[in-house]
């Protein structure tokens, strides 16, 4: 049984990321009723304040979803950061779980700063044909000193939670409608050759920033391209009219390699 993620095969590393994502999706599903109430009935003066609201809700959802913690801190520009032990079929692995919350009236992309990027990215600019690159800002692992003279790398796992909503006007007590919660798992740096081997095989695109104004460079992740590369890496928890909770659906691949969605059971918080 492994403790060093670098000893895992790429398939095993993918399964660790998939297991982590599945836990996050379960936690968000179980909190989705309260999340909708908080998100829709809390006043916010700007889109930036709505994002802060999404960050708080994500924290609330995940506070009961933790595994055995490791008493270390991870410094970084991510909303939710936890160093912990992760039980897996491949061993008990130290992990740095990184979860960042977004909120937008768009449902097709997320914008990341370099400090949130887990793997070196490259893509071809659709208008100019120029190849654009951005180095990863998230380290692949955090080295931990053991009590018995060993060193363990805690693998970083990057998850993004995207709150998709629309603004409401003249609706008493409600300021916006939360329509879906998207949950993305971006691949670890070791998986770059699987997901972004060249500029033309990429789910990345140009981010919105102004070099002339000295703004920090950003990069976009496109949902449809990520789902095409690996269906389970993009999950959607959708609110329907007949339930206070989101629909508990998990996207995956079947044995024939076709995309399927399956309903899962969940508990009330």
Curated annotation (Swiss-Prot):
It catalyses: Endonucleolytic cleavage of DNA to give specific double-stranded fragments with terminal 5'-phosphates. GO terms for biological process: DNA restriction-modification system. Keywords: Endonuclease, Hydrolase, Nuclease, Restriction system. Gene3D superfamilies: 3.40.600.40, Type II restriction enzyme SfiI, DNA-recognition domain. The keyword Nuclease applies. Its EC number is 3.1.21.4. GO terms for molecular function: type II site-specific deoxyribonuclease activity. Transmembrane segments: none annotated. It comes from the Bacteria. This is Type II restriction enzyme SfiI. The lineage of its organism: Bacteria, Bacillati, Actinomycetota, Actinomycetes, Kitasatosporales. The gene is sfiIR.
């Amino acid at each position: 049984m492994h403790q060093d993620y670098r000893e895992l095969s790429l398939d095993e590393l993918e399964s660790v990321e998939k297991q982590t994502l599945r836990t996050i999706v379960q936690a968000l599903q179980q909190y989705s009723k309260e999340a909708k109430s908080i998100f829709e009935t809390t006043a916010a003066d700007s889109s930036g304040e709505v994002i802060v609201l999404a960050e708080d809700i994500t924290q609330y959802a995940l506070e009961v979803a933790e595994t055995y913690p490791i008493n270390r801190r991870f410094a970084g520009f991510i909303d939710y950061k936890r160093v912990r032990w992760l039980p897996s079929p491949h061993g008990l692995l130290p992990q740095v779980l990184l979860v960042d919350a977004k909120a937008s009236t768009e449902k097709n992309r997320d914008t990341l700063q370099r400090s949130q990027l887990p793997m070196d990215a490259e893509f071809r600019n659709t208008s100019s044909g120029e190849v654009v690159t951005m180095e990863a800002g998230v380290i692949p692992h955090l080295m931990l000193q053991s009590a018995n003279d060993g060193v363990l790398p805690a693998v970083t796992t990057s998850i993004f939670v995207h709150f998709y909503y629309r603004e409401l006007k003249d609706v008493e007590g409600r300021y916006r409608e939360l329509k879906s919660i998207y949950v993305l798992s971006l691949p670890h740096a070791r998986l770059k050759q699987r997901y972004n081997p060249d500029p033309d095989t990429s789910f990345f695109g140009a981010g919105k920033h102004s070099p002339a104004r000295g703004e920090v460079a950003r990069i976009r992740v496109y949902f449809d391209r990520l789902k095409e590369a690996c269906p389970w890496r993009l999950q959607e928890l959708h609110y329907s009219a007949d339930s206070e909770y989101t629909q508990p659906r998990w996207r995956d691949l079947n044995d024939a390699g076709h995309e399927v969605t399956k309903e899962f059971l969940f508990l009330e918080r």
